[in-house]
Amino acid sequence: MRYVIKIWLFTIIVSPLLLALILGAIINDSSFKSILNSYEIIFVMIIVGFLSSIPAMVIFWLIKRFLKNKYSTLTAKIILSIYGFLSVWITFFIVDSGFITRWSEQTIWVLIYSLTIVIGVWTFKNNNKEITE
């Protein structure tokens, strides 16, 4: 369970920070000071991300639990990465299906959240041989 919580927290905290930097500095050419002043928006993004990802992370935990002791750590991480990537896309699709057909800032959101969850899967140690979860 700790593995899933680490990935969840990593994704919902790091993704908004990366989004603020990428959207603010690179795309909108904002100053670093104005990016730092948007902490309220980042906080709201963390809360909304937490709430909207609950169903996906429950399924993530169930998949991880199913994979425990049945597959190697490498295979489990590949499966969890694929699910994590797809779960982000599905969640955003439920909110706004139009982001797929048009390139927008929301598409960047999906890419960053997807990559962040995959990075989390591979960064944190997943011990499939744990006795308790």
Give the ranges of each region predicted by the language model.
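Juxtamembrane/disordered regions of integral membrane proteins
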Residues: M1-E133
